[in-house]
């Protein structure tokens, strides 16, 4: 076959290949999926708060705020953002991720290597629980385990009674490890995690950690600081998202 015929045949083959990769979306299907974020509204948030953990509990938001001094756990009205109560830790440690599970409220420390049990009505609201190696970042609970992050590209499943590591799960997207995994949440099916200093949120299927979807928070979500705080509200069927130095808590849905 002469060169022109070879060229025409090659172009036809390429066109057929592209067409075979196209679906109803009218574009080439990406190797790794990305999702969309629907912003529903916002409530005020203290712009001075260095948010490290955010959860929904007892119909309100609970927030762990980092700082030395200045770390505390506070309750927020989920309709207005008003602070309902606040319990400082007296500068004992830099508070990080938090979760309420197994009849307890666990709070991590940043570099102190110590976890705590929080009880706002106790004489000592922050009772030392278990020590661990490395840094403490995000924290959530899945099934019979706690899960924490430490700024690496892995998640650590832990025994809720001893805080011993049960298994380690690496997180990758598009074939590359995802570094700086931070604040965590679990909605009953997926683990959600912020990537520090980015607008990226990753959804990880608990049943298959290789099933990962990335979402990019829009520019209006926490333009003042770093997004780092994600709380699932099953009653309202939405997520609350805020961050470090953010002046709002945003209500969003991920699609």
Indicate residue ranges for each PLM-predicted region:
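Beta-rich, blade/repeat-based domains predominating
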Residues: 46-58, 91-101, 132-143, 148-149, ...
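Short loop/turn segments that connect beta-strands within beta-propeller blades
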Residues: 77-81, 119-123, 159-163, 205-209, ...
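A short beta-strand motif characteristic of beta-propeller blades
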Residues: 38-44, 82-88, 124-130, 167-176, ...
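Conserved beta-strand positions in repeat-built beta-propeller and related beta-rich domains
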Residues: 62-68, 106-112, 146-152, 193-197, ...
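Bacterial signal peptide processing site
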Residues: 22-25
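Hydrophobic, well-structured mid-protein blocks that either form specific transmembrane helices
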Residues: 115-174
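C-terminal motif of bacterial Sec signal peptides marking the signal peptidase cleavage site
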Residues: 17-20
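Blade-loop segments of beta-propeller domains
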Residues: 81-118, 125-138
């Amino acid at each position: 076959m002469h060169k022109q015929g070879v060229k025409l045949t090659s172009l036809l083959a390429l066109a057929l290949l592209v067409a075979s990769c196209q679906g109803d979306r009218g574009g080439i299907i990406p190797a790794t999926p990305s999702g969309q974020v629907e912003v529903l509204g916002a409530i005020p948030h203290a712009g001075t708060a260095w948010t490290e953990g955010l959860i929904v509990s007892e119909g309100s938001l609970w927030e762990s705020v980092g700082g030395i001094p200045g770390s505390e756990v506070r309750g927020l009205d989920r309709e207005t953002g008003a602070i309902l109560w606040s319990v400082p830790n007296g500068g004992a440690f830099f508070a990080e991720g938090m979760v309420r599970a197994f009849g307890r409220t666990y709070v991590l420390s940043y570099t102190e290597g110590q976890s705590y049990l929080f009880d706002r009505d106790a004489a000592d609201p922050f009772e030392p629980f278990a020590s661990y190696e490395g840094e403490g970042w995000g924290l959530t609970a899945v099934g019979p385990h706690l899960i924490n992050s430490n700024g690496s590209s892995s998640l650590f499943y832990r025994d809720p009674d001893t805080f011993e590591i049960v298994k380690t799960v690496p997180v990758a997207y598009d074939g590359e490890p995802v570094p700086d995994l931070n604040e965590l949440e679990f909605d009953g099916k997926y683990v959600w995690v912020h990537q520090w200093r980015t607008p990226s949120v990753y959804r990880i299927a608990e049943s298959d950690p290789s099933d990962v979807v990335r979402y990019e928070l829009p520019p209006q979500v926490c333009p003042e600081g770093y997004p780092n705080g994600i709380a699932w509200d099953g009653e309202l069927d939405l997520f609350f998202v805020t961050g470090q130095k953010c002046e709002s808590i945003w209500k969003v849905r991920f699609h």
